[in-house]
Amino acid sequence: MFGKGGMGNLMKQAQMMQERMAKMQEEIARMEMVGESGAGLVKVTMTGAHTVRKVEIYPSLMEDDKEMLEDLIAAACNDAARIIEENQKAKMAEVTGGMQLPPGMKMPF
């Protein structure tokens, strides 16, 4: 089924891909993305590991409706998480050469 050394080469390629994925995951975890809502009135800085580092709120919002502010903060967090997911997919495509993971399968395996 596998030619001479074929299985060994396949295993070596799999190991190399695994190492590249681990490095990519470390890079993503260190990255910081900024999500926004309310046309930039609320900004959330989040790491690739989904840790919120900073929340910025335009001063005039502090005097406005509390419920609206809560919604804007949640929307900014969701925007940052979406940006992180997009970056993870792009980085994964670099590592896998564009090969898509099966539906429902996420990194790390």
Curated annotation (Swiss-Prot):
InterPro entries named among the record's database cross-references: YbaB-like_sf (IPR036894), YbaB/EbfC (IPR004401)
Location of this chain's protein in the cell: Cytoplasm, Nucleoid
Keyword Cytoplasm applies: yes
Cellular component terms per the entry's GO annotation: bacterial nucleoid; cytosol
GO terms for MF: DNA binding
Assigned keywords, A-Z: Cytoplasm, DNA-binding
Disulfide pattern: none
Residue ranges the record marks as coiled coil: none
Function recorded in the entry: Binds to DNA and alters its conformation. May be involved in regulation of gene expression, nucleoid organization and DNA protection.
Subunit structure: Homodimer.
Membership in a protein family: Belongs to the YbaB/EbfC family.
Protein name: Nucleoid-associated protein SO_2014
Organism name: Shewanella oneidensis (strain ATCC 700550 / JCM 31522 / CIP 106686 / LMG 19005 / NCIMB 14063 / MR-1)
